[in-house]
Amino acid sequence: MNLFLAGLDHTTAPVEIREQLAFSQTDLPSALMQLTSSETGTPPLFAEAVILSTCNRVELYGVTNPGTTAQHVVDFLAAFHRRPAASFVHTLYFYQGEAVARHLCATAAGLRSLVLGEAQIQGQVRNAYEAAQRIGSVGSILHRLFQIALVAGKRVRHETTIGKGAASVSQAGVELARRRLGDLRGREVLLIGGGEVSELAAQNLIANGADRLTIVNRTSARAAALAERYGAEMLDFGALPQALARADIVISSTAAPVPIIYRHHVAEAIAHKQRARACGECDPPTMLLIDLAVPRDIAADVAQIPGVHLFTVDDLREVVSHTIELRSAVLEIAQQIVEEQVQEFLSWMRTQEALPVLTMLRQRAEEVRNEELARALRRLHDLSPEQRAVIEGLSRSIVNKLLHLPTRCLREAAAHGQGKRYASILAELFNLEH
């Protein structure tokens, strides 16, 4: 079995492709089950699997079964999402072994994010791991890998300043609006969505002077809670057309699988604004729409409407590109931390080479102990239960003490890349089948 990763991100695939391969929360159970189980009697692709799907990446982490190839994973993606492989295969990257660990640790640390050092990715990595754990697709290898990657993310944020003042996608979206429109005071701002992205956007909008904020979400309770925290107006989702009609800025970040705003919605909103101005010959009103969702919330052809400016997460590069330069001084330290965590994982992986021999050694020792204990007890008569327990405890203690040193030595040798050599020697010395 081998550690394997297939994925695409904001550096290899535009949002038009990322949204086609994104996995929703409702998709994950089915996808993970398909990857790790088989109804045909043939081995599944993965013995273990985790899917990380965010607005900027879709990545499949797995421990492959013998015979699994990259093409098998491509075929799975094509079949699951009902997309021709030719439409996305050129955007995929594939890693194996050590490179998988390095990629995940760097990802959890925010070093592969569109916004360098952003903190949200660590929670997204944790959520992906926990979702797979609930499904039962996480085994010992991915458990260890994701725990070490999360430590890498935590260490980078605590031991470097790379995350100090780091923008989030939400903050970048607000900054884009500020750059395009200037002062946000008096602007009608519509937030669509009730999750973390919307909450961060609300925080940053208020910090940048926005004072006329409306929140719309399918779940009214979440929208109401956000509105109360940030002094915003809350509207039911059914009032979205009316909210659009008065909005100057729209920031949308729902988890909807298809767009929730189409061209006719925005065209009607612009027409309403035009009528309200009572100026038929004036330039069309402007509306700034920032779509932070993947899959996208706003249909692409909305951008064709005069006066409408539509931006997606891919357009945020112009806002955040400077963060790489600003944080390059601490980037090297962060990469060193990532490498330390990678080496810790690799050391643990090497110790796994020793487990089969150690298991056989322990089993052989138990066989001998049980045989000799039974022989001794047959020769001793009239022992009380307490006396028998003492003798049995003595036999266990002797075995444990005798095995402690070779066990420790083999584990240490394995951690330093000598596991196979020492395991072979131990197997020969104790006549173990290896």
Swiss-Prot record:
One Pfam family this chain carries?
A: GlutR_N
Protein's recorded name: Glutamyl-tRNA reductase
Query: Could you tell me which pathway this protein works in?
Result: Porphyrin-containing compound metabolism; protoporphyrin-IX biosynthesis; 5-aminolevulinate from L-glutamyl-tRNA(Glu): step 1/2; Porphyrin-containing compound metabolism; chlorophyll biosynthesis
Alphabetized, the UniProt keywords read: Chlorophyll biosynthesis, NADP, Oxidoreductase, Porphyrin biosynthesis
What else does UniProt say about it? Answer: During catalysis, the active site Cys acts as a nucleophile attacking the alpha-carbonyl group of tRNA-bound glutamate with the formation of a thioester intermediate between enzyme and glutamate, and the concomitant release of tRNA(Glu). The thioester intermediate is finally reduced by direct hydride transfer from NADPH, to form the product GSA.
Q: Looking at the keywords, is Magnesium present?
A: no
Q: Which family does it belong to?
A: Belongs to the glutamyl-tRNA reductase family.
The free-text domain remark for this protein reads: Possesses an unusual extended V-shaped dimeric structure with each monomer consisting of three distinct domains arranged along a curved 'spinal' alpha-helix. The N-terminal catalytic domain specifically recognizes the glutamate moiety of the substrate. The second domain is the NADPH-binding domain, and the third C-terminal domain is responsible for dimerization.
Sites binding substrate sit at T54, C55, N56, R57, S113, E118, A119, Q120, Q124
Catalytic reactions on record: (S)-4-amino-5-oxopentanoate + tRNA(Glu) + NADP(+) = L-glutamyl-tRNA(Glu) + NADPH + H(+)
| Residues that hold NADP(+) according to the record | G193, G194, G195, E196, V197, S198
Q: Which GO terms describe its molecular function?
A: glutamyl-tRNA reductase activity; NADP binding
Keyword Cell membrane: yes or no? Answer: no
The catalytic residues are C55 (nucleophile)
Quaternary structure, from the entry: Homodimer.
State the function annotated in the UniProt record.
Catalyzes the NADPH-dependent reduction of glutamyl-tRNA(Glu) to glutamate 1-semialdehyde (GSA).
- List, in alphabetical order, the GO biological process terms annotated in this UniProt record: chlorophyll biosynthetic process; protoporphyrinogen IX biosynthetic process from glutamate
Q: Where is this site: Important for activity?
A: H103
EC number(s) recorded for this UniProt protein: 1.2.1.70
